[in-house]
Structure formats: C-alpha cells, structure tokens
C-alpha cells in the first residue's frame, strides 16, 4: 500500500514537474524521490522485473523518479581522492568495513557505483562504472572498464568482461532497459544497447555488438531475431549480404551452449569468496 502511494506521488510529480522551480514544491518532491532512490539502492524495487512467463515488465514510474532525482537535487562537490561536481553520490559513501562484509560486495579501487544502483551479494566490481537505477544480481562479476548503463538489469552469476558497454536508457523515458538474464557471459569489448534482452545462459563472444535493429541470425535454422538473443545461445560477430549485395554487420548464433562452452565460460567461485 505504501509503495502504491509512493508510485502515485511520483506520477503526480512527473505530470507537474514544471512546478519544481518553486522551492517548497521541490523540497516536498525531494523527500518522495529520495524514498524511491533508497528503495532502488537496497534492491527492494527495480526498474524492470521478469514475470513467471519469461516476459519482462518495465516500471516507468521508477524511471521517472530517477529522472526527477536530477531535477530535485543540486550539484555539490564530491571528494573521492579528487573532486567531482554532481547531483548523485557514490553508492558507497559513508560505508565502513563492516557494511562491506555484510553486503559481501568486493569493490576494487577504481570502480564507481552511483547511488540508486543495486549491487547484490558476492558481486565483484573491478574498475568499472555502474549508473543510476542499474541492478546487478548476486554472484556476478563486472570486469575492468565495463560500463553498466542507467536502469540496465544484470542477472545472477554473469560475467561481464573487460571493456563491455551495456546501454542505459533514461531517454526516451518509455524505452525498455537492456536485460542480461542469469548465467550469461558477455565477451570483452562487446556492446549491448537499445533494450536488447540476452536470455538465460547465453554466451556472447568477444566484440559482439547488438542493438534493437541488429540482425541476429541462427546459423542452423536461418531464423532471424531482433532485439533478443534466445536462451543458451553462443553468439559471435559476423556479416550478411543485403538485397543489393552490400555486406552488413550481424550477430550469428553459431550453436547452443554445450559442456565445452560451459567449461570455458564458467565463473570462478574462488574470486567471489
């Protein structure tokens, strides 16, 4: 019931956001928006969630709250062995050693997580960037120089390799975030953007780029997918010919994940201890 009230308040603030120039209106809105940010930060709510039938739903009101966070906060000096000037704090501001032990998060020097992003237990964060509203599920590693965009959803026991870009989406506000389901391996320097869903157990090879309009071709069946990689697919970069014989980039499903693939891409539990 309380969450429904918060949702209703956020939607009302969003409709009347032009009034936020009024200080008292802005002050009242800030109290509500900070409640949403706190719920996001703790993982009690998330921008997108998977239903029992495998479909994902996007909670637009939460995305609206994140956008309103930028409207209701003032930029301030932020000291982290160097100065920044931003509206959003680091998630780990004020944390002590005990809090890190309790959360079972390993945050390597150079990682930066903005407040409102959720990070689950046994997650390893190498020097990387996690943007607002993102959700990183338990047992996942975000490797060096990877960027997780706003509201992106990363599943359990995933490995997001070095230099990977996972697209964010706060504009346009109704667009769906990128979703990486459980037990996926995203190869180095790959890019997934524009609301694409990588289904459970899939493996993307190094340098695979997938957006909403990217052709994803199953080599065995010649079936073409857009915006979604089927479960347990092994995907590599490739090319296909257009109607006028011009070579166009595509992603190719070369096979389904087998035991050999699992051995090559399995996560190392020692690194998460």
From Swiss-Prot:
UniProt catalytic activity: (S)-2,3,4,5-tetrahydrodipicolinate + succinyl-CoA + H2O = (S)-2-succinylamino-6-oxoheptanedioate + CoA
Organismal lineage: Bacteria, Pseudomonadati, Pseudomonadota, Alphaproteobacteria, Rickettsiales
Record text on subunit structure and interactions: Homotrimer.
GO molecular function, one term: 2,3,4,5-tetrahydropyridine-2,6-dicarboxylate N-succinyltransferase activity
Enzyme category, top tier: transferase
UniProt cross-references to SUPFAM superfamilies, sorted A to Z: Trimeric LpxA-like enzymes
Keyword Cytoplasm in annotation: yes
Protein name per Swiss-Prot or TrEMBL: 2,3,4,5-tetrahydropyridine-2,6-dicarboxylate N-succinyltransferase
Amino acids binding substrate: 106, 143
Subcellular location: Cytoplasm
Pfam families named in the record: Hexapep_2, THDPS_N_2
Record keywords, A-Z: Acyltransferase, Amino-acid biosynthesis, Cytoplasm, Diaminopimelate biosynthesis, Lysine biosynthesis, Repeat, Transferase
The protein's Enzyme Commission number: 2.3.1.117
Statement: the UniProt record of this protein carries the keyword Lipoprotein: no
Top-rank taxon: Bacteria
Pathway membership: Amino-acid biosynthesis; L-lysine biosynthesis via DAP pathway; LL-2,6-diaminopimelate from (S)-tetrahydrodipicolinate (succinylase route): step 1/3
CDD domains with a match to the protein in the record: LbH_THP_succinylT
A single Gene Ontology CC term: cytoplasm
Gene3D superfamilies: Hexapeptide repeat proteins, Tetrahydrodipicolinate-N-succinyltransferase, N-terminal domain
One example of a Gene Ontology biological process annotation: lysine biosynthetic process via diaminopimelate
Gene: dapD
């Amino acid at each position: 019931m309380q969450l429904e009230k918060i949702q209703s308040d956020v939607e009302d603030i969003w409709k009347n956001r032009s009034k936020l120039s009024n200080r008292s209106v802005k002050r009242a809105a800030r109290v509500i928006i900070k409640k949403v940010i706190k719920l996001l930060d703790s993982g009690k709510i998330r921008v997108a969630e998977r239903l029992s039938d495998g479909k994902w739903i996007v909670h637009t009101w939460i995305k609206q709250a994140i956008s309103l966070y930028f409207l209701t906060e003032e930029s301030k000096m932020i000291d982290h062995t160097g100065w920044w000037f931003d509206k959003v704090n680091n998630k780990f501001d004020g944390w002590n050693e005990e809090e890190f032990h309790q959360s079972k998060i390993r945050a390597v020097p150079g990682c930066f997580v903005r407040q409102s992003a959720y990070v689950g237990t046994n997650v390893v964060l190498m020097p990387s960037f996690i943007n607002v509203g993102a959700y990183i599920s338990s047992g996942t590693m975000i490797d060096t120089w990877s960027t997780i965009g706003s509201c992106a959803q990363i599943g359990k026991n995933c490995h997001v390799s070095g230099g990977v870009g996972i697209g964010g989406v706060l504009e346009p506000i109704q667009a769906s975030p990128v979703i990486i389901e459980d037990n996926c391996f995203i190869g180095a320097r790959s890019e997934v953007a524009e609301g694409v869903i990588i289904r459970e157990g899939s493996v993307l090879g190094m340098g695979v780029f997938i957006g909403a309009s990217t052709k994803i071709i199953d080599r065995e069946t010649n079936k073409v997918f857009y915006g979604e990689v089927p479960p347990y697919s092994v995907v590599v970069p490739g090319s296909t010919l257009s109607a006028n014989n011009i070579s166009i980039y595509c992603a190719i499903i070369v096979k389904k994940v087998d035991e050999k693939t699992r051995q090559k891409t399995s996560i190392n539990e020692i690194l998460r201890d």
